[in-house]
């Protein structure tokens, strides 16, 4: 208790600056905030990568439906089966392009009148893989 009084007396006499205890409290608070904020930031980044992958798969399915409409309901034999990573625009067939996000790889598996599009993100190995199946019209992820 005496040391606290001495510190207060010194401060009252005009000494300026922070005490060691005050500095330690600030460092501890910053450490706690960092421990909470960093995992949240990493999860948000992963969610953004998953969202980009899902969006690219949806966009590729729209391009594929356009191609099939122009080809009598069938998937052309010359359709490109893989896009990305690193390609920003991917020409799937005859000028029908899809924009591919950074790190996303799209794989198209044609099967006559149906197809599947699988999208994965190389930015993080724990990202989801999205699969669009034209037979069901749905996107699944794992």
Regions found by a protein language model. Give the residues of each.
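Extracytoplasmic/periplasmic mature domains of Sec-exported, cell-envelope-associated bacterial proteins
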Residues: 19, 54-62
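Periplasmic/extracellular, small/polar-rich flexible segments of pilin-like filament-forming proteins
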Residues: 62-142
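Aliphatic-rich helix starts adjacent to a transmembrane/signal segment
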Residues: 11, 42-57, 71
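Hydrophobic core positions within the conserved protein kinase catalytic domain
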Residues: 5-8, 45, 64
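N-terminal single-pass transmembrane signal-anchor helix
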Residues: 13-41
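N-terminal leader/signal peptides at the extreme start of proteins
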Residues: 1-18
């Amino acid at each position: 208790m005496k040391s606290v009084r001495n510190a207060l007396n010194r401060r009252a006499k005009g000494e300026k600056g922070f005490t060691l205890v005050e500095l330690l409290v600030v460092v501890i608070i910053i450490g706690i905030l960092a421990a909470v904020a960093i995992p949240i930031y990493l999860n948000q980044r992963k969610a953004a990568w998953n969202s980009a992958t899902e969006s690219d798969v949806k966009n590729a399915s729209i391009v594929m439906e356009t191609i099939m409409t122009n080809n009598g309901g069938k998937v052309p034999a010359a359709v490109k089966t893989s896009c990305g990573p690193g390609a920003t625009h991917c020409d799937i067939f005859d000028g029908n392009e899809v924009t591919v996000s950074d790190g996303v790889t799209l794989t198209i598996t044609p099967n006559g009148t149906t197809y599947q599009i699988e999208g994965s993100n190389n930015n993080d190995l724990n990202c989801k893989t999205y699969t669009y199946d034209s037979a069901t019209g749905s996107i699944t992820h794992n």
